[in-house]
Curated annotation (Swiss-Prot):
Keywords attached to this entry: Cell inner membrane, Cell membrane, Membrane, Transferase, Transmembrane, Transmembrane helix
Taxonomic path: Bacteria, Pseudomonadati, Pseudomonadota, Gammaproteobacteria, Alteromonadales
Protein known as: Phosphatidylglycerol--prolipoprotein diacylglyceryl transferase
Annotated membrane topology: Multi-pass membrane protein
Keyword Membrane carried by entry: yes
Biological function: Catalyzes the transfer of the diacylglyceryl group from phosphatidylglycerol to the sulfhydryl group of the N-terminal cysteine of a prolipoprotein, the first step in the formation of mature lipoproteins.
GO annotation, cellular component aspect: plasma membrane
Domain of life assignment: Bacteria
A Gene Ontology molecular function term of the record: phosphatidylglycerol-prolipoprotein diacylglyceryl transferase activity
Amino acid sequence: MPSNDYWQFPAIDPVLFHIWGPLDIRWYGLAYIAAFAFAYFWGMRQTKTDPNWSKEEFSDLMFWGFIGVILGGRIGYTLFYHFDYFIDNPLYLFYIHEGGMSFHGGLLGVIAAMYLYARKKQRSFLQVGDFVAPLVPMGLFFGRIGNFINGELWGRAAEVPWAMYFPSGGPVPRHPSQLYEALLEGLLLFAVILWFQRKPRGVGAVSGLFLLGYGVARFIVEFFREPDAHLGLLSLGMSMGQWLTLPMIILGIILMVRAKKQLPTG
C-alpha cells in the first residue's frame, strides 16, 4: 500500500473534453498546439529584430517545420524505441492514436525540413538553425508537461521528499522526471539561449548551444528517468536517450567552437 509520506499523482483526466465518437481533445494534443503557438509567436517577434527574415518567410518555414516534427517524431519513436513492433507489423508506424513521439526523431525531422527549406530559399542551413533554435525549448516544456499530465515517462524509484506515486508506476514513489525535463530542457535552456543571444555570435553558435544544452540536460535527466521497459539500460549502463544525445553534445561543441573562430579577435 502506498505510503502517505510521498505525493500522489494528481488525478488529471488525459482527455480534456470529448467531441464526438472517437474524437477527443487531449491535454497532450493541447500541449502540441501550445508549443507551435509559442514558436509562431516568438518567431514573429524575432522577424522584427532580424532583417534577414520576413514574416512570410518565417510562416513558410513553420509549415515545413510542422511537417518535419510530426513525421520525424513518429518515425523516430517507432524505429528507436519500438522497432520490434514495426518489424512484426509495419502499419504500427501509423498507429498515431496509441500515442508515441520521439524528440530525437522530431529533431531529425525538423533538421531535414530546415535543410530542404534552406536549399529551396538558397539560405545558409546554419543561419536557419540559429533562427529556429530559440523556438524549440518552450515547445519541449509544454510537451513534458503533457507527458506529466498523461502520467507517462515517469522516473526511477526514489525516496526524495517530492517523489510521487504514478498510477502506472507501481507501488513505489518515483522521480517526477517529466518535470525535471520541463525545467531543464524547457525553461532553463530557453533562458540560457536568450542570454547568449545578447551579443553578436558567429553563424551556428546558437544552433550549437541548443544541441549542447539539450544534450547535457537530457543526459542528466536520464539518470532519474525510468528506462523503457523493453530496452532497459544499454552498453556502459546508459539508456537509449543518453546514447542518442551524445552525438548532439559533440556536434554542439563543434558548432560553437567553429562559430567562435568566425568572430574577429580583440
